[in-house]
Amino acid sequence: KWKLIAQYINLYYDMDIIENHPGAPVVKANIGFVDLSYRITNKQSIRFELQHLWDNINRSNTEESATVGHEDVYKKRGNWAAALVEYSIAAKWFVSVGDKYNYGNPIADNRDHYYTASLGYIHESTRIVLTGGRQSEGMVCVGGVCRVVPASSGFSLSITTSF
């Protein structure tokens, strides 16, 4: 009835190359996450996800970068924590709520919560998800395809299928 997945990642992320921020320092981070699922019945389950990112950023890095014109790079830096709870019914419907928070940002005004809530339906190989909340700016990678996304608030509808 219980299922646990845990992972650790040691990340070296060159913002100069990946996001075109010439002269920006390299992000060296450690990421850990735990995904814990519990099957309540044959048709119901609940899943908990916890994530943490430890960043190499500190106040002196931020001040040094601001003097050379990279202060925008630090809007999303510092340690992050995230949590998500998802409830599934009949393996077709699910609802989830989550929060991502960069509590370790050295600039207090940039310590933001990014709340989200989702409702989804799965039929065979098609998944439809309506999500509302806040999205932090930065690189988003799904299935090996990465893109830079702006910060946003609102709703999104996602339809994914395979054939």
Predicted regions and their residues:
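Exposed, low-structure sequence patches enriched in small/polar residues
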Residues: 1-163
